[in-house]
Amino acid sequence: MEELQGYFEKDRSRQQPFLYPLLFQEYIYALAHGRGLNGNSSIFYEPRKVFGYDSKSSLALVKRLITRIYQQNSFLSPVNDSNQNRFVGHHHNNLFYSSFYSQMISEGFAIIVEIPFSLQLVSHFKEKEIPKFHNLRSIHSIFPFLEDKFLHFNYVSDILIPHPIHMEILVQILQCWIQDVPLLHFLGFFLHEYHNWNSFLITKNKSSYSFSKENKRLFRLVYNSYVSECEFVFVFLRKHSSYLRFISFRTFLERRYFYGKMEHRQTEHLIVVYCDYFNGTLWFFKDPFMHYVRCQGKAILSSKGTHLLMKKWKYHFVNFWQYNFHFWYQSYRIHINQLSNCSFYFLGYLSSLLKKSSTVRNQMLENSFLIDTIITKFDTAVPVIFLIGALSKAPFCTVSGHPISKPIWTDLSDSYIIERFGRICRNLSHYHSGSSKKHGLYRIKYILRLSCARTLARKHKSTVRTFMQKLGSGLVEEFFIEGEQGLSLILPKAIPFIFQGSHRERIWYLDIIRINDLVNHS
């Protein structure tokens, strides 16, 4: 990365394209191959093999693919004509080769486009004298903030940020950050052809679904720039309202995914200007207290104001997306609810406000009277139904929650199969440690444990009961003991099993920098 930074600093002053030539540098694809293709951190990762490929990147083949992309209809030629071997020579499976090298270009593209963003971020830290480790804040840091602030709020808007219809919109947004015209031109062409290619793989050849699932790095980066554009109004308020008291935190969870997390924005008054959309008319929305939380494509907007105020904000977002990005957005995708009567799903938790009434008897001399006190508590629960639905998509169970075996893992060793299931279980326990009631995780653990036993029994052509008796407590320890050791660092005393005796303890960890895969699947 130091070599890339030096290249960037060297050519920054020149008025000519300097990012586009990086597409033809060998180390770009070596870096992409090392981080993008082999650096999969998913707990559902299944080894994917491209037949006949020796796991070494070939710059000549990548250059050949880039050249072919510029030719008319060449990107889809291996699909339309199985006898044509344009990309990689004569081979029996051109589909896997073409998707593989297209994925390589996508990963290399992401590394190149990240250069201006990452260097800008580093320079910002140096100017503000912010240590790097302060930037890597945990996802769990959002929930103590919600617990502290949402107790006094009235309404909450559950916003699902829409996906743009046209790929060209994403490229136009990047023009504000990148001035390299050839790179942007090639990016737009690549996104357009990739969209056609991806649609073909999903509809015509389901066996090649891995191509549509693995190319995420570039599209996450481009999508994040689009989401930042959606938050233009908030940035405008911070920069142009000198009298506005504004607290903002922006953290990038991980550089390789380039996700931006807006923890919260706190304002005393909010003024929204619609001068571009309504012929110079100014609309002022004032709110004594408002908070905005976003992670990826899901945002939460809460306020102490009235329901009318929240409806104004709702129509502001709808009009902003329609007029600025030129695509229709359904207003029903923004839900406005009263916090005291609803629960909202955010970051893998079902959050709500619980009101408990406590009665206290007060004795004064000969008179006694009762005092009723209502206590409001911010509650975070484990969404068991969502998790079971995610497990069924993996698949580890049926839609109704009945555990099933994992046939694709039967070629692995017994210890590796147990370790995989145990890792999934520990990740879930770690991620949902902040739940006030963890009893729901017992069912998830049961599904994973029995699915593991069914997988092992299928591998050895035995029954589940026989295999469970053979393993004894070894299988149980793999699912529970390691989680117990992690909790023992926080809880005052050791516990025999994870969550036993601590099912009401809420623990927020500071080392969670990515959303659990089951949360994304749900």
From Swiss-Prot:
It comes from Aristea glauca. GO terms for biological process: mRNA processing; RNA splicing; tRNA processing. This is Maturase K. Keywords: Chloroplast, mRNA processing, Plastid, RNA-binding, tRNA processing. InterPro entries: Domain_X, Maturase_MatK, Maturase_MatK_N. One of its GO terms (cellular component) is chloroplast. Usually encoded in the trnK tRNA gene intron. Probably assists in splicing its own and other chloroplast group II introns. Belongs to the intron maturase 2 family. MatK subfamily. Signal peptide: none annotated. GO terms for molecular function: RNA binding. It is found in: Plastid, Chloroplast. PANTHER family: MATURASE K. HAMAP family: MatK (MF_01390).
